[in-house]
Amino acid sequence: MLFSSVPFLFYFLPAALLIYFAAPRQLKNAVLLLASLFFYAWGEPKYMLLMLVSIVQGYGFGLLIEKHREQKASKVFLTLSILVSLGLLGYFKYADFFLSSVNAVAGLSLPLLKLSLPIGISFYTFQVLSYVIDVYRGETAAQRNFIDLAAYVSLFPQLIAGPIVRYSDVAAELKSRTHSVSAAAEGVRRFMVGFAKKILLANQFGALASVYKSTQDASVLFVWLYALAFLLQVYFDFSGYSDMAIGLGRMLGFHFPENFNYPYISASITEFWRRWHMSLGSWFRDYLYIPLGGSRKGKARQLLNILIVWLATGLWHGAAWTFVLWGLWFAVLLLLEKLALLPVLEKHRVLGHVYTLFFVTLGFVLFDADSAAQAVSRIGAMLGAGGLPLSSAQAVYYLKSYGPLLVLGILCATPLPKMIVAKLRKSKGAATVLDVLEPLFVLIPLLLGTAFLVDGSFNPFLYFRF
């Protein structure tokens, strides 16, 4: 069930909120758990048991790890829990990738399992992993209430596509959280910002990108239009979902971590990945990079650790060689910055912005490709090596049609709109006008977005496949 869908907006969410707020405090987590299981079962009923198995093993091993803390058995239980989590993830997400790779390399014909990817498995697996690891490290107490832990792992606002919420971030709020009209209003506003990003921007850029993929009239201009459209689509799609998730969390009394901080204003790839999908980046830092030694064991080991983390990041995004290459793409850029480029980029920030946007754009062309050959072909065409004409009538038509929206998208991907609103609020008169108009800022995107949804317009969600 997509957040940007009629069933969610007008049936599931109102019913879930009504029952949740009507329930007594001691039953709210149980209501959340049931609502989350229903939400998951709506789109993936056959894999709901898989998520429950992941929750049960995390709950049981968490208790055993805490019970035997400071003993060898604690590490054994941690290892078993990690193996179960990664085993489930590996089997359902990577088995066919492994088999097809073996077939291609060895010339075999091993039968593929042809498993469909369980929705959200990459996200809830990482939450269970962080929970048992934090219990082992003594950074959080094991949760003895199964319903509370299950509600944390399956919490529907962030179940499908994050942010990746660590147990320690919400442990206190699972036990006791406050609800208020102002918090709910804040949540509604944040949700509608994300909804507008998704329906009014991401979907429109996605439609333009899909036109390029289906056209026979290619040109250098059209490839660049596609690349820019996809760059904006993936940002507004994913950051919009994160905004909706954070907003839903506030409605329910939770504070989820921020996931995006205007990544396209970055002046280096290093800065970009501190601003993009921040909950995933911090997860890999704390649970893989630092345990591998981080930067504590010399420069060579640090560079190796970066390479390992980015191979894992690529694979986390998808079971395909294009994602492995995408991870390597950013690993190489980060290594080059670590070795030599960062001082230059920090000194010349304008150059840094151009460099970052250029290489991030090429990276996301690879991210979106069905094969390495397709990515090379598209990138080659962008650089003028594909033998394509510089322009075409179709490319010019779509540039004129989508030009204003592309400019709007570029501006909205910067802090400029937020800065303008903040400046207006310093004026008493302007602030009063904004307060009066605020309901319209919520209602208009809802009406426009609903019109698009009812019309059956283009409405995919990119990160559901992870």
Where are the model-predicted features located?
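Membrane-embedded transmembrane alpha-helical bundles that form the catalytic cores
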Residues: 1-465
